[in-house]
A protein has these predicted regions:
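Bacterial N-terminal signal peptides
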Residues: 1-10
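N-terminal pre-domain segments of enzymes
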Residues: 12-62
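Trp- and acidic/polar-enriched beta-sheet ligand-binding modules for extracellular glycan
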Residues: 17-34, 74-76, 98-107, 115-116, ...
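Predominantly extracellular/luminal regions of secreted and cell-surface proteins
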Residues: 54, 58-90
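Eukaryotic beta-rich interaction modules
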Residues: 89-94, 102-104
Length: 179
């Protein structure tokens, strides 16, 4: 598991729809080259698209509040990289741009240090190889122990193998656009 994350947020009053604009995301260079030989499709896998995804709409002036913030993880000794790479803003797929966690259910937690109204969460797994990402769960909470007030925003765990409930979101092919 390798990833990076961007959280766009502000701590202002909710803006009117007229004040929304596309979230300014600087996407990394597409890293996967070639044609995949095995495309595992099925009812739980979102087919890959050759079109750009629709922009996230957010109030003017939002910023990445996760950038540079402290990251903790269930994996205390990543295979490659440091946990700080999760929030350093670098979304490229070269060897110095990501942290790789050991295979098994893992989590990362970003401490935003204060409460924000979050408008978008964008994350990147490794996007230099063709693979489907399973059991991706995004949760937020004001509780640092994630015991109370936990809200699940995304869950594609179709069999509850991560123990966080069965998700309704689809598994997906990672690409340079993130998720």
């Amino acid at each position: 598991m390798s990833l990076g994350v961007a959280l766009a947020a502000q701590n202002l009053v909710v803006a009117a729809d007229a004040d929304l604009e596309p979230l300014p995301l600087k996407l990394p260079i597409p890293a996967f080259m070639g044609t995949p030989t095995d495309m595992p499709l099925g009812p739980h896998v979102e087919p890959p698209s050759d079109k750009p995804r629709a922009p996230f709409m957010a109030p003017k002036g939002v910023k990445n509040v996760a950038e540079g913030k402290k990251v903790t993880s269930s994996d205390k000794n990543p295979i490659t990289g440091e946990l700080s790479l999760v929030t350093d803003g670098d979304k490229e797929s070269n060897d110095n741009s990501f942290v790789e966690l050991h295979r098994r259910t893992q989590w990362v937690q970003v401490d935003l240090e204060k409460r924000y109204k979050i408008h978008a969460i964008v994350l990147w797994h490794a996007h230099n190889t063709w693979q489907v990402y399973h059991d991706v769960i995004v949760q937020v909470s004001d509780d640092p122990d994630f015991i109370e007030g936990v809200k699940t925003l995304y869950n594609n765990d179709i069999d509850n193998s991560s123990g966080q409930g069965i998700g309704k979101d689809k598994e997906y092919f990672e690409d340079y656009q993130g998720r």
